[in-house]
Curated annotation (Swiss-Prot):
Bias (Basic and acidic residues) ranges: 315-334
UniProt superkingdom: Eukaryota
Subcellular compartments: Cell membrane; Cytoplasm
Posttranslational mods: During host cell invasion, proteolytically cleaved at the cell membrane in the region I by a papain-like cysteine protease of parasite origin. Cleavage is triggered by the sporozoite contact with highly sulfated heparan sulfate proteoglycans (HSPGs) present on the host hepatocyte cell surface. Cleavage exposes the TSP type-1 (TSR) domain and is required for productive invasion of host hepatocytes but not for adhesion to the host cell membrane. Cleavage is dispensable for sporozoite development in the oocyst, motility and for traversal of host and vector cells.
Signal peptide range: 1-20
Keywords: Cell membrane, Cytoplasm, Disulfide bond, Glycoprotein, GPI-anchor, Lipoprotein, Malaria, Membrane, Repeat, Signal, Sporozoite
Domain notes per entry: The N-terminus is involved in the initial binding to heparan sulfate proteoglycans (HSPGs) on the surface of host hepatocytes. The N-terminus masks the TSP type-1 (TSR) domain which maintains the sporozoites in a migratory state, enabling them to complete their journey to the salivary gland in the mosquito vector and then to the host liver. The unmasking of the TSP type-1 (TSR) domain when the sporozoite interacts with the host hepatocyte also protects sporozoites from host antibodies.
Biased composition, class Low complexity, residue ranges: 109-121
Sequence similarity: Belongs to the plasmodium circumsporozoite protein family.
Protein name as annotated: Circumsporozoite protein
Propeptide residue intervals: 407-429
Region Disordered, annotated ranges: 72-121, 307-347
Positions glycosylated per UniProt: T370
Amino acid sequence: MKKLSVLAISSFLIVDFLFPGYHHNSNSTKSRNLSELCYNNVDTKLFNELEVRYSTNQDHFYNYNKTIRLLNENNNEKDGNVTNERKKKPTKAVENKLKQPPGDDDGAGNDAGNDAGNDAGNAAGNAAGNAAGNAAGNAAGNAAGNAAGNAAGNAAGNAAGNDAGNAAGNAAGNAAGNAAGNAAGNDAGNAAGNAAGNAAGNAAGNAAGNAAGNAAGNAAGNAAGNAAGNDAGNAAGNAAGNAAGNAAGNAAGNAAGNAAGNAAGNAAGNAAGNAAGNAAGNAAGNAAGNAAGNAAGNAAGNAAGNAAGNAAGNEKAKNKDNKVDANTNKKDNQEENNDSSNGPSEEHIKNYLESIRNSITEEWSPCSVTCGSGIRARRKVGAKNKKPAELVLSDLETEICSLDKCSSIFNVVSNSLGIVLVLVLILFH
């Protein structure tokens, strides 16, 4: 009887170990079925693809107002009261215009040869309508005090040779429309005080050679639209105080070479969108105070001077807390359904990656769970030489792993009892 019992128990244990596929027990390292689904970013995008969203179509009803236009309707015609009375226009009286014989109708004191209508005191040769005091040769319409040779319409005090429309005080040779005080050679539309050679539209005080639209005080060579105080070579739209070479849209105080959109105080070489105080070389999107080399998306509030990623001490504290969370998540996952279709949660993924930050290599890490669906990760080739503290999500390659067969307490107890029974029967036989 004892031999029969030993034989039965031994047979059960032999079958249990030789054919693991027919019972609940299995080696966790040999029964991991890793799916080929790979993804590079461990974030909510992985789970958004698995969600089924239902949307309801809403019907929109529109009320259309019909507009009826009544064209060419006459109420009088409908009533039959059409009157064709018209007001008679009075005939114009015939005016008899008689040509006056040519003569000298100049005012008292005009020199000989002045046309009719000149005021007293005009020199000979002035056209009709000149005010008193005009020199000989002024065209009709010049105000009193214009020098000989001024075109019609020049204000009093313009030098000889100024075009029509120049204000009083313009030098000879100024184009029409120049303000008083402009030097000879200024284009039309230049404000008073512009140097010779300034394009039309320059403000007063611009140096020679400035393009149209430059504000007062800009150095020579500035493009149109630069504010006062910009150095030569600044693009259009730069604020006052920007150094030479800054792109359009940079705020005042940016160093040379900053891209458009950088805030004031950014060092040379910062990408567009960097906040004030970022060091040179920061990528676009870095918050204020981030040190050089921090990747885009680092949260605001990182102390200036911290190296990329947090300090080693902070990382150790974080890893310690994350390991506790990861172990808790592993325990919870073991008690859940073993169905591989249930993907790991976002929190589980983040905690697992933090727990293996210091030990992750180019080889695949163990699966994050011992039962059900989890993830495993490894470094990308480009992040081979990075320190653990410098690793970000984009430096890791991850994929889902699932364990279809899981060991239970029943298997452990049954195997243990079987071994104990065999030993008892053998030793005390």
